[in-house]
Amino acid sequence: MWSIVTDPIKDLISKVVKNSIHPDFHDAVSKMTIIDAFLFFIVHSIDKLGIWHRLPVFFGLLYLAIRRHLHQEYNLLNVGTTPVGIRSNPSDFPYRTADGRYNDPFNDGAGSQGSFFGRNILPVDQKNKLLKPDPMVVVTKLLERKTYKDTGTQFNVIAASWIQFMIHDWIDHMEDTKQVELSAPSEVASQCPLKSFKFFKTKEIPTGFYDIKTGHANVRTPWWDGSVVYGSNEQVLNKVRTFKDGKLKISKEGHLLHNEDGTAISGDIRNSWAGVTTLQTLFVQEHNAVCDALKKENSDLEDEDLYRHARLVTSAVIAKIHTIDWTVELLKTDTLLAGMRANWYGLLGKQFKDRFGHVGNSILSGFVGMKRSENHGVPYSLTEEFATVYRMHPLLPDSLHLRDISASPGPNKSPPLIKEIPMNDLIGLQGEKTLLEIGNAKKLVSMGHQACGALELWNYPSWLRNLVPHNIDGTERSDHVDLAALEVYRDRERNVARYNQFRRGLLLIPISKWEDLTDDEEAIKVLEEVYGDDVEELDVLVGLMAEKKIKGFAISETAFVIFLLMASRRLEADRFFTSNFNEETYTKKGLEWVNTTESLKDVIDRHHPEMTHKWLNSSSAFSVWDTSPNKHNHIPIYFRVPN
């Protein structure tokens, strides 16, 4: 009976699809519900005009909400088998476990160390195309830095350090014991720092699942649980804890402690550099300050309880800073300012939520504080495509501009330049030594006043093409690697779709010619030289760097769509941001700490009280510090129209 009503509607939609929708999406739309097909038609129509980011803020948010809904329905793919039924009681684990287990009561292992990377797009077998075109040719001709291009005043080196700090919290692939060797073809060998290099394959693991038969394990915990500070297992956690008053280890001078081999004692130290170490130090100080505040509020709390509550609070502070401070600077538009704040506070805003609590659904009050977590029927993980779009090494400069913080501030609170320190002196074990000489305060101010690199073609740091990689414990390996070439190879090896199929999978209109990707004539010429006329062969990393950017965005729109989906998922799927975001779990003082922290500046102010007053002129600690602060806009944000 119901089919009498629905069949004519489906026929009508089918005709609309054939006439109005890009042919590449006909099959995808045919598998959608009637409502979702209609929603896709709206999004696709706007995409064809390329105007969503120019819409008034409220309508831009509506577009993004519809697009996110579609991705939640069709771009969350489970890898591996899923247990059935309730597996654990949340009240037995009112804290973040060392290895990420027991967050999801229906799936003990979801988000744990060693769990599978998920997928946003079905894997595309590239075993026969691992060297087509050769990764070292791709890098030499299209990615390697010619001259340093920065982001102007929008994003600084703290911001570049922050995202690596987050990667060390979220993702790292398990390696196999088998090695692969790449050799530079003769046409580019003279321009490659390494003529050949060896590295370990990504370990391929059977999933026991009929659809996606093999997957890759994440050796970090993908929850937003601060594992960059605490580690992803009990062994590392025990090394960083003092087991006194809930605190973590740190020197009297405010530095991380070090092992005899020179490696830092911290949650995750693999392939690190002084910028990440500086942030790890800052958040060890934050954790310990939370412990002091909690103990002052309740002197009966024991070491274990203090640690557990302080970890919850510190992890939430990190997540909040990333959501409403870092990302807002990355995507510097009114629409994304409103959108990211809505993720945390909802459309009703901070003042309403602070006064009345979480009211209604996530649209009105945000994901944080929802009555129950939401994984959209797919166990929580971070995905292969997520790892791909976070390949952001062009953000790194060639040297750090060290500043004199003993001098008087210059114009816009700028400190004088002392010298430039090459990045090779700031990475790995040498970087730990250099940071001890510089000090955290001078390092923070110096990074704050220096613009980071732009995510564009010909801006991948040359010094990363001859890099000493680390073992998981932070010790150095003997074989150097060309990181740029390795990143191109890794996406192919892990069966991540190439750029055009990547876009199709995300319901984004694919390119049909190089001119659709970029207006840069030199780039078009070299793209043709490397890939010929076949746009389907374009590597996703190259496409993300080449793509025309939305005004205000430091990343490509393609990467942003993954952000749109996964940034929400990191909050809404985690019970410690939803059903357990309460005084009972965090304590009254702990919840107050999270709710009153709005930015990285707030954290810096707690541990370096004079620093921002003396040296920070900008509105955010993630934009260049001597920039003028944002001007107050009297127009309510939802009624603003982008310039």
From Swiss-Prot:
Cofactor(s) required for function per UniProt: heme b; Ca(2+)
Catalytic class of the enzyme: oxidoreductase
Family designation: Belongs to the peroxidase family.
Lineage: Eukaryota, Viridiplantae, Streptophyta, Embryophyta, Tracheophyta
Cofactor mode of binding and number, as noted: Binds 1 heme b (iron(II)-protoporphyrin IX) group per subunit.
Catalytic activity: hexadecanoate + O2 = (2R)-2-hydroperoxyhexadecanoate; dodecanoate + O2 = (2R)-2-hydroperoxydodecanoate
Swiss-Prot/TrEMBL keywords: Calcium, Dioxygenase, Fatty acid biosynthesis, Fatty acid metabolism, Heme, Iron, Lipid biosynthesis, Lipid metabolism, Metal-binding, Oxidoreductase, Oxylipin biosynthesis, Peroxidase, Plant defense
Origin superkingdom: Eukaryota
Enzyme Commission code: 1.13.11.92
Function: Alpha-dioxygenase that catalyzes the primary oxygenation step of a variety of 14-20 carbon fatty acids, containing up to three unsaturated bonds, into their corresponding 2R-hydroperoxides. Involved in the production of oxylipins that function in cell signaling, wound healing, and protection from infection. The alpha-oxidation pathway of fatty acids may play a role during plant developmental processes.
Biological source species: Pisum sativum (Garden pea)
SUPFAM superfamilies for the chain: Heme-dependent peroxidases
Residues given in the record as heme b binding sites: 173, 393, 490, 494
Marked site (Transition state stabilizer) residue numbers: 270
Record's protein name: Alpha-dioxygenase PIOX
Gene: alphaDOX1
InterPro entries in the cross-refs: A_dioxygenase, Haem_peroxidase_animal, Haem_peroxidase_sf, Haem_peroxidase_sf_animal, Oxylipin_biosynth_metab
Pfam families given in the database record: An_peroxidase (PF03098)
Database matches in PROSITE patterns: PEROXIDASE_3
Binding site for Ca(2+): 169, 221, 223, 225, 227
